[in-house]
């Protein structure tokens, strides 16, 4: 079944899972919400009763406009979870949103029909990457976009750290939710230094997958075709 991983860094380290009822024609869903967001206006990862799931990573090399509207990723994802049943629904919704959208992010999505993709989105443009087109059978993103400006953004070493872990696990067919949260989200291996710092008593908090701003690690298991 498809797996969607969200390793979240945030200023609010207190996150919670909120259940949203189906109201006003919206779909029922659950989502990851900031602790200080008492009205649950923003969702940072989640899945709905149609088997559609979404997460995002912030991008820092994709914005190419002067619009002041920004940081609307959580608002958009809450809307998406209430309205979208498939990856294609999500693609159509993105096309229909008024411009500027006010986002700069990589949105990862999966559905119950086997769809899985990343959408790299800024306020005016959408770039789509389907997992089915990846020779590895999976896609990874950190804090830059493949379609964005080269050599800008963040998380290049972090990406390589994750790519090393996934490459080995994929060859062994051992990628599971438990492995992702228990190994990947806790890995202190630094690929440039070729060393695992997990057992060190002191280490500079830089370039690892986990960091002091990590607030949550969530893996959403998708639905198989024969499941409801």
Regions found by a protein language model. Name each.
Residues 86-95, 197-203:
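Charged, amphipathic alpha-helical segments
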Residues 1-41, 45-46, 50-82, 105, ...:
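C-terminal, well-structured catalytic/ligand-binding subdomain of enzymes
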Residues 89-108:
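Secretory/export targeting leaders with adjacent low-complexity proregions
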